[in-house]
Swiss-Prot record:
Residues 24-106 form the Lipoyl-binding domain. NCBIfam families: gcvH (TIGR00527), PRK01202.1 (NF002270). GO terms for cellular component: cytosol; glycine cleavage complex. This is Glycine cleavage system H protein. Keywords: Lipoyl. InterPro entries: 2-oxoA_DH_lipoyl-BS, Biotin_lipoyl, GCV_H, GCV_H/Fam206, GCV_H_sub, Single_hybrid_motif. The lineage of its organism: Bacteria, Pseudomonadati, Pseudomonadota, Gammaproteobacteria, Lysobacterales. It holds the Pfam family GCV_H. The modification N6-lipoyllysine is found at K65.
Length: 131
């Protein structure tokens, strides 16, 4: 298992969020998730301006193995999407915590962050899934 950056928060469904200034939340999927999915072949991104509620489907990724919904970790408005993924979905496989980010959400309820998993808690979820 790769190192999990300490500045991230997670959903049990393997999405991560990195909080920046001005209530901006960058969202992607974990290294564990991209490993499970295998080689990604398609990413359906949300539209800029879309309103997302925490826990609802925000995007869809498809691999050679399966399609998987990506859930929004926070409530807010999509203000940016990673258009690189349209042509190079494998960027998520190559750099899930960096260049493989999926979208940026302007959070409307920053307090939701406290409901998300810390890197240590997420690691425990992964370890319990393996047994």
């Amino acid at each position: 298992m790769s190192d999990i950056p300490g500045d991230l928060k997670f959903l049990k469904s393997h999405e991560w969020v990195r909080i920046e200034d001005n209530n901006r939340a960058i969202v992607g999927i974990s290294d564990h998730a991209q490993n499970l999915l295998g080689d990604l072949v398609y990413v359906e991104l949300p539209n800029i301006g879309d309103h997302l509620d925490a826990g609802t489907t925000a995007a869809v990724i498809e691999s050679v193995k399966a399609a998987s919904d990506i859930y929004s970790p926070v409530t807010g408005k999509v203000i940016e999407v990673n258009t690189t993924l349209s042509d190079k979905p494998e960027t998520i496989n190559e750099d899930p915590y960096g260049e493989g980010w999926i979208m940026v959400i302007e959070m409307q309820a920053p307090e939701e962050i406290s409901d998300l998993l810390s890197p240590d808690d997420y690691t425990k979820v992964l370890e319990s899934d393996e047994h």
